[in-house]
Amino acid sequence: MNGIKQLHAHCLRTGVDETKDLLQRLLLIPNLVYARKLFDHHQNSCTFLYNKLIQAYYVHHQPHESIVLYNLLSFDGLRPSHHTFNFIFAASASFSSARPLRLLHSQFFRSGFESDSFCCTTLITAYAKLGALCCARRVFDEMSKRDVPVWNAMITGYQRRGDMKAAMELFDSMPRKNVTSWTTVISGFSQNGNYSEALKMFLCMEKDKSVKPNHITVVSVLPACANLGELEIGRRLEGYARENGFFDNIYVCNATIEMYSKCGMIDVAKRLFEELGNQRNLCSWNSMIGSLATHGKHDEALTLFAQMLREGEKPDAVTFVGLLLACVHGGMVVKGQELFKSMEEVHKISPKLEHYGCMIDLLGRVGKLQEAYDLIKTMPMKPDAVVWGTLLGACSFHGNVEIAEIASEALFKLEPTNPGNCVIMSNIYAANEKWDGVLRMRKLMKKETMTKAAGYSYFVEVGVDVHKFTVEDKSHPRSYEIYQVLEEIFRRMKLEKSRFDSLLQPEQLCI
């Protein structure tokens, strides 16, 4: 910085104009305050200098200053270039409304740059980020020539809004696809929870010899493998990532750890976590702590948290979800309460709904139902169905009718068409021989339109076929064979005298 100031002083003394060089050096540091003062005192501003500063303000999250400079450019009698519009469109995407962008769009249209593919791509992206997909699509449709980035920008817009049907219609219409095109739709399906389609698209991508998956593709596919239990494909992706040097990318490493954890390979996940060494980030720690908690290794999760603090990594809200989950699975009430209390007092983290949910679960499992209910009453946010459902489940286990009635009443308001709450409450009444309550639940179910959503599981078969099995469904082409196998399994279970917990009630009281 001292060198720049000395050069600036030399220019002022000698009258040599080195503003362009000085400005670019200042923006590299960056020192926007000094750069703006230099710019404002410069007598012969040009579009190039305006563009550099407009871009700098956008990059450093000051989009309003970019707009101010864009307006000054016109007052100075200068014409914006295609670079100007590209930078100002990108800056406008940070606003809460699409109105400024529409005004800029109209000026862009009159400027003669409307056929510039690069600017149109940025304009489509900006409209999409602001949720103005109709405007983005209009720009796309009015273009006479569309290159691959333009197609990708429009597909990404639909993907971000969760409209995968529109995204796939465009994707299928593309004359030529690149790795970004494939990765965008794969990521879209994965982020929207449609893991089977994400995996199917990846397997189709592998057949396209003109494209090669990149590290973003790998990061997008691994969650699908994790949630579908596709360990073999996950292993193949790990090998591919290592061969292509993608394991230098922390996001690839974290996604791989998550995949192995969810596929039950916790020891492999731990080994990969140790391999990361100093490369580990907060996401790595959170993923490993959460995985250990999920697999019942609560002591290891807490030990890892202590190591995390020793190494100077600051926890966040996600960290404490994993820690409290470990306490829930380990039945460690006191430790859970200590951690919950430390969130605000030590780490300055405000507990969220999921943290309260963990605490309700923790207290409920050990029978501290009144304490759990008291905690719900102190929550700064409105308890959701998960919180009340957790309390109701605990009441069912411990046979507490009084608090169960409070929880069920809240659930009936939040989920009036969910029959599960009525069934649980009916079972609680029956276990305590309160048959009038059972009849009341039965009448409520008949009065209200309650339908239970069918449960299902995904199983990935050979090739790209993913089969969805629904409870009592017979639409599968091999359903006869499937049910034959199930009957044989049930027969063998009975022979082994497997015991099922079921509550038998008088026929007139059954739901």
From Swiss-Prot:
UniProt keyword annotations, A-Z: Repeat
Region ranges (Type E(+) motif): 463-494
Family classification: Belongs to the PPR family. PCMP-E subfamily.
Annotated spans, Type E motif: 387-462
Gene3D superfamilies: Tetratricopeptide repeat domain
Pfam families: E_motif, Eplus_motif, PPR, PPR_2, PPR_3
Protein name: Pentatricopeptide repeat-containing protein At5g08510
Any one GO molecular function term: RNA binding
GO process annotations (BP): RNA modification
InterPro entries documented for this protein: E_motif, Eplus_motif, Pentatricopeptide_rpt, PPR_At4g14850-like_plant, TPR-like_helical_dom_sf
Positions of PPR repeats: 46-80, 81-115, 116-146, 147-181, 182-213, 214-248, 249-279, 281-315, 316-346, 352-382
